[in-house]
């Protein structure tokens, strides 16, 4: 019950068709699906089917089995099966269409700090629209459970001089989102918030996507080390999150 796994097609990588190193694809796929998008979708469907307990293989004739456990020709699921495991899967959506697809597949939604939708709106506004589309599609499909939706933000609360020394002085983050090209697509990149807790709270309350989501993920720069990451989390939990309505689990 404590596992939560995020999945997506993935961002560009240094390797050329890296999936081929693991036995997937070939010359035909390289021509028809050079970025591996269709391959990723196919494998994700297989992954979900396995999690949901669908038959993934056919039982051998009974006399050939060891140990002899299944009727010949029976459909075999992945065992042990954990009911509900598929409800703890999150799909990372980079477009509105991908978010709607996640709803149809019945998985939670992650929207990160980059979205390939550039209509002049801010990242928060674009993601709020993405979330709305996801929820409308979810309701239309008629799933019998309530999904979760997350957005990610790089946030560095500056509480004292040591924070400023590590992460930069208050107000030194970008003042606005930016437009760039990644994987041959134009996308909007979210700004980094480096500021005092009150300014961060003010900015997040104006962020329509943060307000629409039920989960806010912090992007922690792991290259800064464990201590720096822990400091970011502590400052956010102590000075920012309570102002957004969050209560620690220690309160029961």
Regions found by a protein language model. Name each.
Residues 1-252:
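Active-site-adjacent structural elements that line small-molecule/cofactor binding pockets in enzymes
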């Amino acid at each position: 019950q404590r596992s939560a796994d995020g999945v997506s097609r993935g961002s560009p990588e240094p390797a050329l068709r890296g999936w081929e190193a693991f036995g997937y694809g070939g010359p035909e796929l390289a021509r028809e699906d050079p970025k591996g998008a269709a391959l990723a979708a196919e494998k994700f469907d297989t992954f979900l089917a396995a999690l949901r307990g669908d038959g993934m293989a056919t039982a051998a004739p009974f006399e050939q089995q060891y140990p002899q456990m299944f009727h010949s020709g029976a459909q075999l699921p992945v065992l042990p099966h954990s009911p509900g495991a598929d409800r703890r899967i999150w799909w990372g959506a980079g477009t509105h269409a991908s978010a709607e697809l996640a709803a149809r597949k019945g998985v939670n939604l992650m929207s990160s700090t980059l979205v390939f939708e550039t209509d002049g709106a801010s990242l928060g506004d674009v993601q709020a629209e993405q979330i709305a589309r996801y929820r409308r599609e979810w309701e239309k499909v008629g799933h019998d459970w309530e999904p979760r939706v997350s957005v990610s933000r790089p946030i560095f609360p500056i509480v004292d001089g040591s924070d400023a020394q590590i992460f930069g002085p208050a107000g030194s983050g970008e003042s606005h989102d930016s437009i760039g090209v990644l994987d041959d697509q134009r996308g909007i990149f979210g700004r980094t918030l480096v500021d005092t807790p009150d300014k961060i709270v003010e900015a997040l309350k104006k962020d329509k996507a943060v307000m629409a989501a039920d989960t806010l993920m912090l992007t922690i720069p792991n290259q800064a080390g464990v201590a720096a990451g822990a400091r970011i989390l502590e400052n956010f939990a102590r000075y920012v999150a309570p102002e957004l309505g969050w209560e620690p689990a220690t309160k029961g």
